[in-house]
Amino acid sequence: MDVNTKDGKGRIPIHYATYSKQHEITQILILLQPGSEIDTVDNYGGTPFFYLLLKHESGQNKTLLDFFLR
């Protein structure tokens, strides 16, 4: 699986994983393997980090926030 393959909306799998509140942190961390383009902007101007902040309460998923901020 190429974690950087875009769909018709310009999104890569990590966009959907961070947008969904039903994700497992381990699934997201798997998608965040070396070479993952985590700053990919979709057709709507959103990055995976943007969707993570949009969909999750502050303080939730600190592990993911720490990963994106390093």
UniProtKB/Swiss-Prot annotation:
Keywords linked to the UniProt accession: ANK repeat
Gene3D superfamilies membership: Ankyrin repeat-containing domain
Residues spanning the membrane: none
Alphabetized InterPro entries for the sequence: Ankyrin_rpt, Ankyrin_rpt-contain_sf
Organism domain of life: Bacteria
Stretches forming ANK repeats: 9-43
SUPFAM superfamilies: Ankyrin repeat
Protein's UniProt name: Putative ankyrin repeat protein RC0502
Origin organism lineage: Bacteria, Pseudomonadati, Pseudomonadota, Alphaproteobacteria, Rickettsiales
